[in-house]
From Swiss-Prot:
Name listed for the protein in its UniProt record: Uncharacterized protein NCU11158
Biased composition (Basic and acidic residues): 228-239
Disordered: annotated segments: 1-25, 185-275
Highest classification ranks of the organism: Eukaryota, Fungi, Dikarya, Ascomycota, Pezizomycotina
Organism: Neurospora crassa (strain ATCC 24698 / 74-OR23-1A / CBS 708.71 / DSM 1257 / FGSC 987)
Length: 275
């Protein structure tokens, strides 16, 4: 639709936009595959979010259907030609569905414009009686289109069905539930084996150490090397006495874990008492 006029591919003829002419042209497009009868979209035409949702949903449905076939029946009994035929049929139905949505939106837009013109002054549109008469003539076609459109929606929204002719033979049968059960059991067995291995390697020592720590809290021992000048203080008082060499003694002090850290003065007092 360009400037209120419709342009057809293959011809330079421009005709004024009219609802009934649009209806006849839509009927032609639905029954013919001629390239010269397809509409040329205007540069400002954009696909609606509703159409995009339909495209995404349908493509997800197609992907889910093929994945379900491959996962549920690993020895897939469908030939390549059959799979190509199914894919082509799905694509064709998707194209038809999108085309129906596009035509339906165009029809509703044309009806709304024509209704506004008729109600405003009955000068820009056809009389209501003539419009209703022409609609009555095309009623069967419209009914068939509605039925087909509903069928397409039902096809898209229903989950994928597998016919009996596509079921694998008894020799190629594959129990999906049994596979899931075996796989879950296999996972549990692997988990228990890993747990046993960890317990055998580290579990005994770790558990034994933790139990001993819970039962009793042993006192921590620290080895402190104290450099004691011996009688240095007394020699400092008496200048006449000679300085003596420092004597290195090793003292083992028991520090309780519950008590806080001892100050250096307390340690020196303990050392003096011991000496």
């Amino acid at each position: 639709m360009i400037g209120g006029e419709r342009v057809l591919l293959g011809s330079q003829k421009r005709e004024p936009s009219n609802e009934e002419d649009d209806q006849e042209q839509l009927d032609i497009d639905l029954t013919s595959d001629g390239k010269n009868q397809r509409y040329q979209p205007a540069p400002n035409d954009t696909i609606s979010r509703y159409h995009l949702n339909h495209i995404v949903y349908t493509l997800r449905w197609v992907i889910m259907a093929f994945k379900k076939l491959k996962t549920k029946y690993p020895p897939l009994c469908l030939s390549d030609s059959k799979m190509d035929q199914i894919a082509a049929d799905l694509i064709r139905r998707l194209h038809v569905l999108l085309r129906r949505e596009e035509l339906r939106s165009e029809m509703s837009r044309g009806r709304r414009v024509s209704r506004n013109l008729t109600e405003a002054g009955r000068n820009g549109g056809l009389p209501l009686g003539l419009r209703r008469a022409r609609r009555a003539q095309s009623a069967p076609d419209r009914t068939e289109r509605i039925k087909f459109y509903q069928e397409m929606l039902r096809f898209v929204r229903e989950p994928p069905m597998i016919s009996t002719s596509l079921q694998p033979s008894p020799a190629e049968s594959w129990d999906h539930d049994r596979f899931l059960k075996d796989w879950s059991q296999r996972g549990e067995e692997e988990e228990t084996d890993d747990t046993k291995e960890l317990c055998e390697t580290y579990g005994g020592e770790v558990n034994q150490d933790s139990r001993e720590e819970d039962q009793q809290a042993p006192a921590e021992t620290e080895v402190i090397e104290v450099c004691k000048p011996g009688d240095g203080e007394e020699n400092a008082k008496d200048d006449s006495e000679q300085e003596q060499a420092p004597v290195v003694t090793t003292e083992v002090i028991e520090v309780q874990s519950s008590s806080g850290s001892n100050s250096p003065d307390d340690g020196n007092e303990q050392l003096r008492h011991h000496m």
